[in-house]
Swiss-Prot record:
It comes from Plasmodium ovale. The gene is FNT. GO terms for cellular component: plasma membrane; vacuolar membrane. InterPro entries: Aquaporin-like, For/NO2_transpt, For/NO2_transpt_CS. It is a multi-pass membrane protein. This is Formate-nitrite transporter. It holds the Pfam family Form_Nir_trans. The lineage of its organism: Eukaryota, Sar, Alveolata, Apicomplexa, Aconoidasida.
Length: 313
């Protein structure tokens, strides 16, 4: 429990580069609460944009990884170099989403769930935000896959074997993803969204720009290189795989991968992270509400500091 003489105030002039764990949680709840204030149309636009960003960077990651999948090069560096390059390129998507204020379903599983647990959004608002976010991400990722990745022919199968390494790289990724068992896929998806939600938490905790970039980059890189399953990234990757006729089927994509990945991602954000954080920091948020009037400010421009009645702690 917070000390009786402790309160939370909004200090826009703070020079601190990071928040305490209590402050970070308060910012997370406020961030989740703000999602419900947007109209459905704005939410959809933000979600589509996030899906496009995931598609843009997944495309770039596929090309970069595929270049190192060239069979003669693999003799010297091995296939692991392709995975390293793929993972190193993909985090740019999350930096794009953060800097533009776009809306990603997987991050919402933490932030909006904490707001729901505190009663800051209703069950109906919660379902609205989560469904629009997922649908918009799907539309954005699949649209980019069709109009840019498929339309450009970047991943198409080539007649010459020496030029077929990019197609083969994507094919091998897709085949691996659909050959997990249902339970394996859920477990990999849980691991993935722990990293993604922590990346969101880092953004809310770290106020220094370079520190935020590094923390987000390595959190996302960790899940990408580990082979975890991310629903929005998989929506892009597996749908472009279907479009270019790789060795996967529609049933495998949607029922052996996307469905369990969705379940696992939600479990990670809502149950593995949101519920324990709510249990640990619930009293701090309640105290924050009692001691402070709503500021109406933007979370990007304010700092929540802990101060007592006599001055800064």
């Amino acid at each position: 429990m917070p000390k009786s003489n402790t309160k939370y105030v909004i200090d826009p002039l703070s020079v601190k580069t990071s928040c305490s764990s209590e402050e970070s949680y308060i910012r997370c709840v406020e961030y989740g609460k703000s999602k419900a204030h947007y109209s459905s149309l704005i939410l959809l636009a933000k979600a589509i944009l996030a899906g496009v960003f995931v598609g843009v960077c997944a495309h770039a990651s596929g090309i970069a990884g595929g270049l190192f999948y060239y069979h003669k090069l693999r003799e010297y560096v091995g296939a692991s170099m392709s995975a390293f390059v793929y993972g190193f390129t993909f985090p740019i998507a999350f930096l794009c989403i953060i800097c533009t204020g776009s809306d990603l379903f997987t991050g919402n599983t933490l932030a909006v769930t904490t707001a729901l647990l505190h009663g800051k959004v209703s069950c109906l608002e919660y379902v609205r935000v989560m469904c629009i976010s997922l649908f918009g991400n799907y539309v954005g990722a699949v649209s980019f896959a069709f109009f840019v990745s498929y339309g450009s022919g970047a991943f198409h199968k080539k007649e010459q074997v020496d030029k077929n390494h990019i197609f083969q790289f994507l094919n091998d990724i897709a085949v691996k993803k659909v050959n997990h068992t249902f339970v394996e896929c859920i477990c990999l998806a849980i691991g993935c969204n722990i990293f993604v939600c922590l990346a969101v938490y880092f953004v809310l905790s770290i106020k220094d720009g370079s520190g935020m970039v590094f923390s987000v980059f390595f959190a996302v890189y960790a899940f990408a290189i580990a082979g975890y399953e991310h629903i929005i990234a998989n929506i892009y990757t597996l749908n472009i795989s279907l479009m270019i006729d790789t060795e996967v089927s529609f049933t495998q994509v949607y029922f052996k991968n996307l469905l369990p990945t969705l379940i696992g991602n939600y479990i990670a954000g809502a149950l593995v992270l949101a519920c324990p954080l709510f249990f640990i920091y619930r009293s701090y948020y309640i105290n924050y509400e009692k001691m402070n009037e709503p500021s109406g400010g933007s979370l990007r421009s304010i700092s929540i500091e802990m101060k007592n009645d006599g001055g800064a702690t």
